[in-house]
């Protein structure tokens, strides 16, 4: 029998490099996720019974049938939701009053209800397939922003103007707390952790126009929307 040896062509080489790059990219995402979840197990505690009970009530109102666990940790500066089957809302180890926690939990439950974590996972796979295309990675960043806007819109859609202002104040308070620690080493660890968890965060590291656009959507929901806001509306 003659051993078949494929003929070398530049096309075959490019396809081989493409496949190898995709396998490496997706493998790294999976490994980072596994390590992040494993590391968190040793650095989290359960939320108080009162906070867990309130989260249970909010998740039920959002139409979530599965149990959403509340965990507290020193590893993050701002709340984050993660988990594909075991749903977890992770909050920083600091005091939250009922008002702030209620709006944060509602926002994070909207992410769960909208399957945003799965959308981010599919986006990671897409970026893994087209790892060589910079536009794929820009799409990932903009999509995360759009998903945050969609949750803000859903949370505030049935709120009065005064309560929208309160939600805005909660968001600003969390952004301020995030900014105060942003330059610290803890912030770098948090950014890496959130990225590894493929999670959704209440506060992101967006700047400038994106922050303004997010605030405008909350405070002026009836104002003529920009192109990106129309995308968010379409996603709903």
Question: Where are the model-predicted features located?
Answer:
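Hydrophobic topogenic segments
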Residues: 1-236
């Amino acid at each position: 029998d003659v051993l078949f040896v494929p003929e070398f062509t530049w096309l075959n080489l490019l396809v081989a490099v493409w496949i190898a790059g995709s396998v490496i990219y997706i493998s790294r995402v999976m490994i980072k996720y596994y390590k992040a979840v494993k590391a968190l197990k040793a650095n989290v505690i359960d939320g108080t019974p009162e906070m867990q009970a309130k989260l249970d009530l909010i998740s039920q109102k959002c139409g979530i049938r599965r149990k959403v666990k509340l965990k507290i940790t020193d590893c993050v500066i701002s709340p984050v939701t993660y988990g594909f089957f075991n749903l977890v809302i992770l909050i920083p180890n600091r005091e939250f009053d009922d008002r702030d926690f209620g709006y944060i939990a509602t926002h994070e439950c909207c992410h769960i209800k909208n399957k945003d974590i799965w959308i981010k996972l599919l986006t990671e796979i897409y970026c893994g397939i087209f790892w060589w295309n910079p536009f794929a990675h820009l799409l990932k960043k903009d999509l995360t922003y759009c998903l945050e806007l969609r949750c803000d819109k859903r949370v505030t859609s049935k709120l009065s103007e005064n309560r929208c202002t309160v939600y805005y104040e909660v968001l600003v308070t969390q952004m301020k707390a995030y900014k105060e620690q942003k330059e610290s080493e803890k912030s770098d660890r948090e950014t890496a952790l959130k990225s590894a968890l493929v999670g959704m965060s209440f506060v992101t590291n967006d700047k400038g126009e994106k922050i303004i656009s997010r605030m405008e959507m909350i405070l002026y929901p009836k104002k003529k929307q920009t192109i990106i806001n129309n995308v968010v509306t379409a996603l709903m």
